């Protein structure tokens, strides 16, 4: 994208505030016009003083312009600040909502820390552009456009000096941007690397401590920051050179104006006040050119950040619900997969031509080796991914025609990784049903056998669980997740090895709660511990994304196939009678 395209798209984010932004910009343009009048008035004052006939009216007018300009600038700047801050806050909220709505495959491919870093840096960059647009960008352009003809009307020769000064500024800026284009892109790449390393290390700090990686990870970060500085320094050097060249040009221009102006005053072609006015014009021009240079630097440095953000924004635009999708209501729980296929990009993993039917209220266990596609099936059911072929139906309705919100309201999931947020225990359980009362939360916790450890905490249900629930044990986190699913009370239940983190005694208590929860609900059990699938009405054995075996527990146990072999390996199939031993 060109710099102009990047800038124009940045301004399009202000569309919702169009009226207020237009008023602020218009006010700044008026202020820019007033600043051009000030040097002229000051020149008149000097002429009046030189002639020995000071004009009080002009003096008061000049002072009034200055006071008005100052007060108006403060008010306009205040409004511009509020608009820019407000738009940044709304942008963060909007982009955050779109990002978290994306499928897991998008997050795995993009990287959560990368998306977060891109969003945060872009929001700060856009904030700076919006603020300067409202404060200076258009005002600077208008001031420069008006300054030249005004100066021409006073003296062509001195005006040419100002024009040459402007051309020098433009040439220097163009040269530096050409020299630093690749370097600035490299700087942004290194920033992403640094942020990703910090985020990755801190999120896995327990591993870092366990394997004594503190020094190694710190050294790695030092290496990354050194590479960042190696890329940053040449860019900074070029802009420092540009600043020096601009200062030389502005000083030389002022000197030339004074020399030529003195000669013209001596020859009687100009008054002293005219020269003073031109010096004011020169100072004004230099200030505006400096603003242009800062704008050029700003948009140039923003280029890599915003290009990455625009790619991010474009990639999340397609998650809007298709027009015409309807809500899923009065769900019985009949589920059917019809020749469903889905492949992950650049891998051999996924599911291939999967077909099965689950009647309302039945329990189906999905087993198989790691990477067989068990979790993928459940993600397809919840429209985390969309099938590339085939259909998934609930109560006879293709879920691709159902709104995601109503679909997911009908499914309660207990993940193997409990998914605990950095909030209170009550807040984590309330995720199951936002409008749940405190009494509802307590009942759900009791059903999940969680009240014992909750009540042992000083703050009880108000206990802050820490980041990812790190102040709780694995079993405690899992029981909160089960309580959340109980509270949701959805007609379809998904258990992703829900008791895997529990000890034997707690597992028995939770199993009773889960058995009650499964009643009159369609239940999917993703099983790694095969002792949990005994009571399933139907068992699917997946391997490499395909259904290898399907049938009842006892049927598959006696069949002597892949499922029976897995039971035998797990110690759940007796060699003498080849029957499953009920565990628990």
Swiss-Prot record:
Q: How does it sit in the membrane?
A: Multi-pass membrane protein
| Bilayer-crossing regions | 29-49, 57-77, 136-156, 158-178, 248-268, 272-292
Under the heading Pfam families, the entry gives:
ABC_membrane, ABC_tran
* Gene3D superfamilies in alphabetical order: ABC transporter type 1, transmembrane domain (1.20.1560.10), P-loop containing nucleotide triphosphate hydrolases (3.40.50.300)
Whether Transport counts among this entry's keywords is: yes
EC number(s) reported in the record: 7.5.2.3
Q: Which domain of life is it from?
A: Bacteria
What is the name attached to this protein's record? Answer: Beta-(1-->2)glucan export ATP-binding/permease protein NdvA
UniProt organism field: Agrobacterium vitis
């Amino acid at each position: 994208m060109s710099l102009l395209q990047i800038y124009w798209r940045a301004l399009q984010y202000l569309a919702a505030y169009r009226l207020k932004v237009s008023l602020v910009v218009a006010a700044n343009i008026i202020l820019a016009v007033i600043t051009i009048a000030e040097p002229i008035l000051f020149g008149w004052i000097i002429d009046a003083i030189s002639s020995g006939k000071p004009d009080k009216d002009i003096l008061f007018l000049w002072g009034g312009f200055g006071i008005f300009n100052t007060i108006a600038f403060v008010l306009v700047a205040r409004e511009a600040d509020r608009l820019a801050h407000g738009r940044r806050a709304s942008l963060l909220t909007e982009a955050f909502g779109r990002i978290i709505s994306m499928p897991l495959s998008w997050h795995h491919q993009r990287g959560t820390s990368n998306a977060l870093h891109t969003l945060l840096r872009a929001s700060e960059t856009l904030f700076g552009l919006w603020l300067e647009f409202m404060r200076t960008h258009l005002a600077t352009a208008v001031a420069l456009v008006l300054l030249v003809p005004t100066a021409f009307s006073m003296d062509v020769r001195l005006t040419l000096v100002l024009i040459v000064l402007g051309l020098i500024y433009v040439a220097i800026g163009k040269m530096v941007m050409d020299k630093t284009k690749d370097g600035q892109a490299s700087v942004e790449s290194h920033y992403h690397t640094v942020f990703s390393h910090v985020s990755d290390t801190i999120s896995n700090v327990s591993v870092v401590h366990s394997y004594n990686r503190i020094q190694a990870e710190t050294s790695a970060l030092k290496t990354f920051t050194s590479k960042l500085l190696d890329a940053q320094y040449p860019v900074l050097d070029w802009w420092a050179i540009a600043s020096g060249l601009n200062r030389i040009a502005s000083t030389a221009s002022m000197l030339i104006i004074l020399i030529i102006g003195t000669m013209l005053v001596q020859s009687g072609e100009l008054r002293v006040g005219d020269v003073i006015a031109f010096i004011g014009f020169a100072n004004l021009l230099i200030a505006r050119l400096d603003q242009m240079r800062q704008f050029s630097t700003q948009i140039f440095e923003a280029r890599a950040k915003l290009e990455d953000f625009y790619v991010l924004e474009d990639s999340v635009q397609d998650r809007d619900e298709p027009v015409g999708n309807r809500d899923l209501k009065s769900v019985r729980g009949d589920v059917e997969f019809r020749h469903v296929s889905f492949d992950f990009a650049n891998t051999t993993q996924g599911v291939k031509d999967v077909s099965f039917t689950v009647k309302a209220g039945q329990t189906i266990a999905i087993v198989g080796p790691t990477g067989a596609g068990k979790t993928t099936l459940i993600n397809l059911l919840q429209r985390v991914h969309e099938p590339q072929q085939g259909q998934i139906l609930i109560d006879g309705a293709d879920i691709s025609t159902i709104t995601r919100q109503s679909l997911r309201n009908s499914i309660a999931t207990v993940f193997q990784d409990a998914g605990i947020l950095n909030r209170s225990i009550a807040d984590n359980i309330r995720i199951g049903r936002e409008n749940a009362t405190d009494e509802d939360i307590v009942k759900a916790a009791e059903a999940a056998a969680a009240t014992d450890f909750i009540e042992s905490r000083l703050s009880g249900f108000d206990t802050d669980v820490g980041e990812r629930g790190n102040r709780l044990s694995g079993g405690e986190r899992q029981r909160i997740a089960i309580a959340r699913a109980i509270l949701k009370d959805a007609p379809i239940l998904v258990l992703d090895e829900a008791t895997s983190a529990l000890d034997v005694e707690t597992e028995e208590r939770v199993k009773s709660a889960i058995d009650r929860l499964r009643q009159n609900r369609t239940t999917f059990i993703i099983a790694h511990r095969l002792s949990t699938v005994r009571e399933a009405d139907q068992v699917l054995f997946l391997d490499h994304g395909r259904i290898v075996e399907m049938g009842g527990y006892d049927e598959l146990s006696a069949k002597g196939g892949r499922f029976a072999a897995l039971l035998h390996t797990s110690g759940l199939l007796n060699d003498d009678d080849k029957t499953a031993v009920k565990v628990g």
